[in-house]
């Protein structure tokens, strides 16, 4: 995930160029609606956006699935950061910022936030089981459900994935749907990494790679292609010259 050497970036560029031939677009916003409407069959999404898409499609009895590459994936998170020196020396602003973080970290507000945005909670809940109860309420199977699985989430709530207190009895299809997206199992987390910050040199290399993928690359044209382009330009110029001469003759008459 974090290799930025020239050889790896070049290999990634070639793969992306091949994908481009069969890709609707390179983006992560309108893809949610495109998945729901069936315009596209696969879309690279953040987990919370994937949950939103799965939920929306399900309203129309259209069932989508969520998957993580076997090779690797990135562990991502949105974070609020409190500077160790405060906020420009303003004690009142620092207190307000800390109060906001504390407010957003209250288990009851965490549940409200999860319900609204579809993303995994920032905390496990500490002494409160309300967050686990909410996850169980969302994904726990009905009592009369026949095809169910035991889905351990102890790694998140207690740090022990064998903890019997944190196992959700879910419908079997949740192994590749919303529950999987919000609480990926340990084997997925073990092959996931946090993406590193690109320094200036690597950032420039990655940006150039994207330019090469998204834009037309003149360097990729063969001499036959250039010959065809040249012939086309000659034909167009000849047509323009003939048109102008014809127009000049008509005006003289």
Locate predicted features:
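Sec-exported extracytoplasmic/periplasmic mature domains
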Residues: 17-24, 36, 40, 55, ...
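Solvent-exposed loop/turn segments at secondary-structure junctions
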Residues: 47-51, 71-73, 87-88, 108
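Mature extracytoplasmic/periplasmic domains
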Residues: 82-182
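Conserved C-terminal helix/tail region of periplasmic/extracytoplasmic solute-binding proteins
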Residues: 158-253
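Second-shell loop/turn segments in exported
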Residues: 2-3, 20-23, 84-87, 193-197
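Soluble non-cytosolic domains of exported or imported proteins
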Residues: 6-10, 29, 91-95, 197-204
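Ligand-binding pocket segment of bilobal, Venus flytrap-like solute-binding proteins
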Residues: 1-65
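Periplasmic-binding protein-like
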Residues: 15-17, 61-84
